[in-house]
Amino acid sequence: IGLMLKLLSKDQIVLMPTTNSAYGTGDKDNYCNEESPLRPISQYAIEKVEIEQELMEQLNAISFRLATVFGMSPRMRIDLLVNDFTYRAVNDRFVVLFESHFKRNYIHVRDVSRVFQHALNNHDVMKGEIYNVGLSDANVSKKELCEYIQKQVPDFIFIDEQIGKDPDQRNYIVSNEKIESTGFKTEFSLDRGIGELLKGYTMIKNSLYGNV
């Protein structure tokens, strides 16, 4: 990516998906906006931070710090939290939670595509900036996420394990006010996405693509 950025013309528009996992654990209140210090934990987040630093040297670049993505797509990422927990609700009917109070922000995959379209249509006023992209009403803990799922799968059981530690220590509340101030509004709620996943997983469970 560094080589690609060096070869770009000055007029080239660059829209880059980065990640809000770069915030790591947030401040003392776990609150993060685009000015918050970055504390990446995973190698993935560390490399995304390095890429973003190079990216923002480009005058026409925009970085989207995406929340954890969810929703049906042609080739699923079941390891992402909403997709994962909903899959477990369909197939296992239970999940064991470690550090269930840890919070994350979420965004539907179709809203991700919509924010790229929004940036292309509003590039002149958005360029040269970093934007968090997530659902402002979906800064929720793992336990709260399970409660969202349980509303649609009443027999889904989640167990809050008091012993043990989640290897993923991300815990933060993310502000999306900056991207919203440009006129971007999300369309796909957490409830809607969970319903979509439940339907999708039920349809593909016994198909050739049941492992997606």
What are these regions (language model features)?
Residues D92-R93, L97-V212:
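C-terminal substrate-binding subdomain of Rossmann-fold SDR/epimerase-dehydratase oxidoreductases
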Residues G2-Q43:
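Conserved Rossmann-fold NAD(P)-dependent oxidoreductase catalytic core, especially the SDR/UDP-sugar
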Residues T25-K28, R39-R65, V90-N91:
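Active-site Tyr-X1-5-Lys
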